[in-house]
Curated annotation (Swiss-Prot):
Similarity-based family: Belongs to the LpxB family.
Species this protein is from: Shigella boydii serotype 18 (strain CDC 3083-94 / BS512)
Pfam family, one: LpxB
Catalytic activity: 2-N,3-O-bis[(3R)-3-hydroxytetradecanoyl]-alpha-D-glucosaminyl 1-phosphate + UDP-2-N,3-O-bis[(3R)-3-hydroxytetradecanoyl]-alpha-D-glucosamine = lipid A disaccharide (E. coli) + UDP + H(+); a lipid X + a UDP-2-N,3-O-bis[(3R)-3-hydroxyacyl]-alpha-D-glucosamine = a lipid A disaccharide + UDP + H(+)
Coiled coil segments of this chain: none
Pathway where this protein functions: Glycolipid biosynthesis; lipid IV(A) biosynthesis; lipid IV(A) from (3R)-3-hydroxytetradecanoyl-[acyl-carrier-protein] and UDP-N-acetyl-alpha-D-glucosamine: step 5/6
Family annotation (SUPFAM superfamilies): UDP-Glycosyltransferase/glycogen phosphorylase (SSF53756)
Identification of the protein by name: Lipid-A-disaccharide synthase
Length: 382
């Protein structure tokens, strides 16, 4: 930062989640430095906060090998152009938000030109392809991590990392209102309620929906009043789930929801879900859960050799023990899933203990991440 110009922060976000993080960071920085300038690759939320978009975020938001290969020339052109233009601009700090395949190389290019770089949101290097940590260390001055065990991993390799807490933990209340959520969904306050979340990807919904439905059928034999809510992320996943349900359980009554995953978790006594961010959200909703996951045999064989962690779900990784039951591959079948869920639906000691631990873990990662990230950027800019 010089006397002649305002604090200048360059940012690159590659998808909607990054746009949300970038907007929160910009907002927190503007509160401290009102005349700061923000430029880079931005989505609508970042632009609404005043970020000047040299490229639209959608340019980077490609998924899948085929799509990436089809856009590779354009992506490489954008990265080369940003390397040149940021090099000329000399921002006080560059912040690459997630999108590691694009951003980490860009961060390395900029660091060689003397520009300070931050990578915001650690890739899952602690879980697999751990040698990426060395490239990240060469490319960045600082990694901003959502979770404490991520910082512990970087510390082991002497890569500067700051634990800032998780934005989702900031956004969700420590004590959610179950009855209010039930009112929104039309679920009676005194009924037993189970949430089924078979994933956001097509392959997950295809692999898990039938077994999740069969599990719910078994549970309703014990709890005839069992209300079952199934939030689905979009119309495509809903159509897919409805097709599978028509084959497996055509007359079985469930509440299908368009989105509303968070409300479903808060409203429910227990949840059966695929792993991923949903498990963290379910923990923050204080909803006892069982994780069920299945993938193609070769993919699972490969994952077992590549993944270096003892657990797949974030609640267990945060707790450092099997806090929630994980039933994977051949273990992910209706009898075993139902047996794991039954004591949670009873809403007794097991559920209460899990709820209390979820609350403790929530407090650990509720650190006002936007403010922490802004503070880290300003400290590096000085």
């Amino acid at each position: 930062m010089t006397e002649q110009r305002p604090l200048t922060i360059a940012l690159v976000a590659g998808e909607t989640s990054g746009d949300i993080l970038g907007a929160g960071l910009i907002r927190a920085l503007k509160e401290r430095v009102p005349n700061a300038r923000f430029v880079g690759v931005a989505g609508p939320r970042m632009q609404a906060e005043g970020c000047e978009a040299w490229y639209e975020m959608e340019e980077l938001a490609v998924m899948g090998i085929v799509e990436v290969l089809g856009r590779l020339r354009r992506l490489l052109h954008i990265r080369a152009d940003l390397t040149k233009r940021f090099g000329e601009l000399k921002p006080d700090v560059f912040v690459g938000i997630d999108a590691p395949d694009f951003n980490i190389t860009l961060e390395g290019n900029l660091k060689k030109q003397g520009i300070k770089t931050i990578h915001y949101v650690s890739p899952s290097v602690w879980a697999w392809r751990q040698k990426r940590v060395f490239k990240i260390g060469r490319a960045t001055d600082l990694v901003l991590a959502f979770l404490p065990f991520e910082k512990a991993f970087y510390d082991k390799y002497n890569v500067p990392c700051r634990f800032i807490g998780h934005t989702m933990a900031d956004a969700m209340p420590l004590d959610p209102d179950k009855n209010a959520a039930r009112d929104v969904l039309g679920i009676p306050h005194d009924a037993h309620c189970l949430a089924l979340l078979p994933g956001s990807r097509g392959a997950e919904v295809e692999m898990l929906s039938a077994d999740f439905l069969k599990t719910a059928q078994l549970l309703r034999q014990t709890y005839p009043d069992l209300e079952i809510v199934v939030p689905l992320v979009n119309a495509k996943r809903r159509e897919q789930f409805e097709r599978i349900k028509a084959e497996v359980a055509p007359d079985f009554s469930v509440h299908l929801l368009d989105g509303m995953g968070r409300e479903a978790m808060v409203a429910s006594d227990a949840a059966l879900l695929a792993s991923g961010t949903a498990a963290l959200e379910c923990m923050l909703a204080k909803c006892p859960m069982v994780v069920g996951y299945r993938m193609k045999p070769f993919t699972f064989w490969l994952a077992k050799r590549l993944v270096k962690t003892d657990y797949v779900s974030l609640p267990n990784l945060l707790a450092g023990r099997e806090l929630v039951k994980e039933l994977l591959q051949e273990e992910c079948e209706p009898q075993k899933l139902a047996a794991a869920l039954l004591p949670l639906l009873a809403n007794g000691k097991i559920s209460h203990a899990m709820h209390d631990t979820f609350r403790e873990l929530h407090q650990q990662i509720r650190c006002n991440a936007d403010e922490q990230a802004a503070q880290a950027v300003l400290e590096l800019a000085q």
